[in-house]
Amino acid sequence: MPSKTDFTSSTMTPREIVQELDRHIVGQQAAKRSVAIALRNRWRRMQLPEELRNEVMPKNILMIGPTGVGKTEIARRLATLANAPFVKVEATRFTEVGYVGKDVEQIGRDLVDTAVKMYREQAKVRVRTQAEEYAEERILDALLPRRSVGIGFDADADAIRQEPSAHESETRAKFRRMLRSGELEEREIELDVAVNVSMDIMTPPGMEEMGQQLRQMFSNIGGGKSQKRKLAIKAARPLLIEEEAAKLVNEDEIRAAAIEACEQNGIVFIDEIDKVVKRGDTVGGGDVSREGVQRDLLPLVEGSNVSTKYGTIRTNHILFIASGAFHLTKPSDLIPELQGRFPIRVELDALSKADFIRILTEPKAALTKQYQELLKTEGVSLDFTEDAIDRIAEIAYLVNERQENIGARRLHTVLERLLETLSYESPDRDGESVTVDADYVNAHLGELVKDPDLSRYIL
């Protein structure tokens, strides 16, 4: 059975979590600290006596800030650090019960699906060595079928299989050596391979869960079937290992442990929550449905039971982190009950020119490094000077100030436009070295920046 410690929350300290986030995200220290503390509190809670543990509720977080400043990126990086079931959803995907669309309980189902998948992968890793041994035996059986004698119509297939003779054992050992040395990789063998019976069922919007259950039902009805296939050994091996690993893991234990992990350590990130907020100066229309989504979210965040195909989960101790730009609305426009369920508020800062310079140079996978590596595949060596980085950051900042502020995403647009010609011609410029300096940037982008009408449509 999977150990209960397999999926306990991350044991990283808040300082270590912030340091890890710093490798990928520039600035926003307040948001990083809040997320790090919340993640550490998951671990702290699990160290308490069970009676007290059930009384400690997670302190949900609301992140507020303009688009492109790192809210979603924090969530994406958090997923890799959490070592717990984690799901990110957009609030705009959901509608009030009774309207066409997904209901908010789908969040709980998605979380359990994620946990079961993660647990299953962990279980398969643990039994992989044994699965590889079984797969090897099946390949050898296909290469050298074992002799069997018929005793009668009612005889069991395993009971009538004879022990291999000394000659057969020697031949089998020889083939095993050849198999392990890779000499037989291209040899074709005939195998009985399990068939996954899948049926595509079209369902109306909002009824995806019913469609999933119907697909599962038809899959179970047709389960256990196999078909003969001729495959090269190198293609057959991964299929057989996967099949044998699936036989070795205990699905019931995986499901039970996954539900436990969701209830105790699950984390849900709800993005774009400001898009389901009713604006104070409007009445009726779509705002009715938006407020309905908030009311549907409320029991989920407060703590309720959600039915999934793996069993019922309680959401009392799931950590919810919500984020939104709140351009046209305010956090106070959320319904009061939901406001109270997000006691920790964090405001993310708009990005300055200095932040853009850091974004272009500091992160592990900075945009400039990405372009350098991409063009290196064509044999082109790309280098950015300091004054080029400064000018790119300045242009991105100016365009954001002049038009809609889309934060760091503006850098993608500016760099793509700057390097468009080079990216197009790079296959014909193998072996060249290209240095991007301030003059190069001005030559390619200067006119666009000067003309507000052009930059509005191109940058």
From Swiss-Prot:
One Pfam match: AAA
Biological process annotations from GO: protein unfolding; proteolysis involved in protein catabolic process
Residues involved in ATP binding: 26, 68-73, 271, 337, 409
CDD domains tied to this protein: RecA-like_HslU (cd19498)
GO-annotated molecular function: ATP binding; ATP hydrolysis activity; peptidase activity; proteasome-activating activity
Keyword Chaperone recorded: yes
Subcellular locations according to the entry: Cytoplasm
Keywords, sorted A to Z: ATP-binding, Chaperone, Cytoplasm, Nucleotide-binding, Stress response
Entry's Gene Ontology cellular component terms: HslUV protease complex
Record family assignment: Belongs to the ClpX chaperone family. HslU subfamily.
Protein task: ATPase subunit of a proteasome-like degradation complex; this subunit has chaperone activity. The binding of ATP and its subsequent hydrolysis by HslU are essential for unfolding of protein substrates subsequently hydrolyzed by HslV. HslU recognizes the N-terminal part of its protein substrates and unfolds these before they are guided to HslV for hydrolysis.
HAMAP family to which the protein is assigned, alphabetical: HslU (MF_00249)
Assembly information from the UniProt record: A double ring-shaped homohexamer of HslV is capped on each side by a ring-shaped HslU homohexamer. The assembly of the HslU/HslV complex is dependent on binding of ATP.
Protein's name in the database: ATP-dependent protease ATPase subunit HslU
